[in-house]
């Protein structure tokens, strides 16, 4: 399908059903919709495994704007059937209230395909039952490491900005695979308060600018097996007692810059087997007797 406008749709209380599902489509605009379903509210797909790669029709030039998502497993989901690729997608001016997840990208070994050039802006999330953000290349937990090939999925060049969230179970996670890290994500002007923070495992070139993450347990940011991490002007308004704001495990080249942690903490970060560069920071220390 090409050059399609979907506007003013209201879907409510559909059991075990997606709301709107563009698959291998081009030039689609979804706007001014109210969606409350039993499965994902909006799902973008492009075929599955070898058949999807052979057909080779990406889902591209997709705009989602001015929509409200209530309940449903995911607000906007890409995958896991994305073997033909998904590119040039914008999601803006939306509310997610009561969905299991907000923005969710999922794939696994064997799928192949590239998800890239995704922009998410001006989003409000509330009462998210699981994760606000998911970027998961390890959806099939039984898969084993294999050489990079057409079977290898890729997530890259994804940017999220101007997002607020409250009453959230977990801010989210990034999960790459050993042969293909998640690459080139940026988060800017984001404020999230959740029970659990943001966990990043096997990723590179990940950047946070003017971001406030607060979690009720553990550290708001947790990085492992990562490269090229930039934390610029990040903080936690409600840090957990004696927990660092950031933890690094096996991280190569992380930069912490312009971070002003005004709520006192014992340690802004803790690192193990990691290379960390600091610059122009102020971290107010807790006083311990």
For each of these PLM feature ranges, what is it?
Residues 1-12:
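Single conserved hydrophobic/aromatic residue that forms the stacking wall/gate
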Residues 10-289:
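Extracellular/periplasmic carbohydrate-active domains that bind, remodel
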